[in-house]
A protein has these predicted regions:
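N-terminal cationic and glycine-rich segments that engage phosphates or anionic surfaces
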Residues: 1-434
Length: 434
């Protein structure tokens, strides 16, 4: 990745794009530090430290910590991600939207993007109101007037729309997917606080305390163990992210005039983790609904149902893993349609050796997809569940979303690297591929 950036920096046009991305990221980080008035951020931050394993903790990590301090960009990319998920689901369930996506071309793509923007605005308003109610219910407001409510909700909503706009600027004028890069920047910005968290835990152990400022006691010997474990997880995630099953494709020869065309061989790559991190995000959102309800309605926090779905309970982990498997299959079928791929091969005169074009090819690809997706789903479940179990055993809540964070960072880094390489190939800089 660093070598790719170094080579891209030598290309004037790509250097401008990289500088533009850096400029947008500076604005994004500045916005993450502008406080919203009328909120006791110290008490709110302590509350989020206690709720770090819930969906609120995940939102705080994905926002770069701004959600836990109620800054102007507290909602960050969450409304946009939720809007994108909803639109993806609706394009499968509603035929007109499906036709618009499939047959609409560039105009259809722009219409879906406009729908996603308006949905982001609506969800930003809804989540801004919900966040305001969370802050108000727990007594973190210095002013409970209607005017204060309007200012707070409007600021949160405007911040979510502004983040969406920043992401679109990176996508249009920079490198890679803008929203993903903002998500990457938010997670990376939490790295210093995670290091400090582990340092405080070791210091508390040395002092013989039961708890400290970070509410954790950590044996110093465990710090290198966790670091080695994180490195091994990073290597594992990179390896699986780059793994794919290649099915050979042969194209029939045809004669046009005096020349012969076709006959070349290629492959159809099917990635092990085709759906990326989306199954984890969506599964955690649903599995954490009881804990989120308890956060917004404190009177329900002692109910048996809420306790059963505590984010460190066995039931939560089982439901979470099953949801990840289910959504992995769902997103895999959205991104790779065996019937559509088979029909396209048939139209282009291609076939998979040993299988007739049409239905046999579709059945073969579907069989391969199901097997690959099962392995990918189990891999995602392990990445998501293992840090939760480890964090519960060693009483380190910050580990609970460590696997998800590493997976997001790796996925975005690899996608951005591919985007840089594609831009360099367009400029005929291919030496880095050797």
């Amino acid at each position: 990745m660093i070598e790719t950036i170094r080579k891209a920096w030598k290309v004037p046009e790509l250097r401008k794009k990289l500088l533009y991305v850096a400029f947008i990221l500076v604005i994004f980080r500045l916005g993450n530090n502008i406080p919203v008035p009328f909120i006791n951020t110290t008490a709110l931050q302590a509350y989020f430290n206690a709720a770090s394993t819930s969906i609120l903790g995940l939102m705080n990590v994905m926002s770069g910590g701004s959600f836990g301090t109620a800054t102007m960009l507290a909602l960050s990319i969450q409304p946009y991600i939720n809007a994108s998920i909803i639109i993806q689901l609706l394009t499968v369930a509603i035929p007109p939207l499906e036709r618009l996506q499939r047959d609409g071309g560039e105009a259809g793509k722009r219409k879906l993007e406009a729908i996603t923007r308006y949905s982001t605005l609506a969800l930003g308003l809804l989540q801004g109101f919900g966040y305001y109610m969370l802050i108000r219910t727990n007594g973190f407001l210095s002013d409970t007037s209607v005017w204060a409510a309007i200012v707070i909700i409007a600021t949160f909503t405007a911040g979510s729309v502004f983040v969406m706009w920043l992401g679109e600027q990176i996508t249009g004028m920079g490198i890679g997917n803008g929203i993903s890069i903002l998500l990457f920047a938010g997670i990376i910005s939490r790295l210093p606080s995670a290091v400090f968290y582990m340092y405080e835990g070791a210091k508390n152990w040395a002092a013989g305390k039961e708890s400290g400022g970070t509410d954790v006691v950590l044996h110093p010997v465990m710090i290198p163990v966790f670091l080695i474990g994180m490195i091994l997880m990073l290597v594992f995630i990179v390896y699986i992210s780059l793994s794919e099953r290649k099915s050979p494709v042969q194209y029939a020869k045809r004669v046009v005039g005096r020349k012969m065309y076709g006959g070349q061989a290629t492959t159809i790559p099917i990635k092990v983790n085709m759906s990326g991190v989306m199954p984890i995000i969506f599964a955690q959102t649903i599995a954490s609904i009881p804990a989120t309800i308890a956060a917004f309605v404190p009177s329900m926090s002692d109910s048996t149902f809420i306790r059963l779905f505590d984010t460190t309970s066995v039931i939560y982990c089982v439901v979470y893993a099953l949801l990840i498997v289910g959504f992995s299959y769902f997103y895999a079928t959205i991104q790779f349609n065996p019937v559509e791929v088979s029909n396209n091969l048939k139209k282009q005169g291609g076939f998979i050796p040993g299988y007739r074009a049409g239905r046999p090819t579709a059945e073969f690809l579907s069989k391969i997809l199901n097997r690959i997706t099962l392995f990918g789903a189990i891999y995602l479940a392990i990445v998501a569940i293992l840090p939760i179990v480890t964090g519960a055993i060693f009483r380190i809540s910050a580990l609970a979303i460590g696997g998800t964070s590493v997976l997001i960072v790796v996925s975005v880094a690899l996608d951005t690297q591919k985007s840089l390489e594609a831009n360099m190939m367009m400029k005929q800089y291919k030496g880095f591929l050797n």
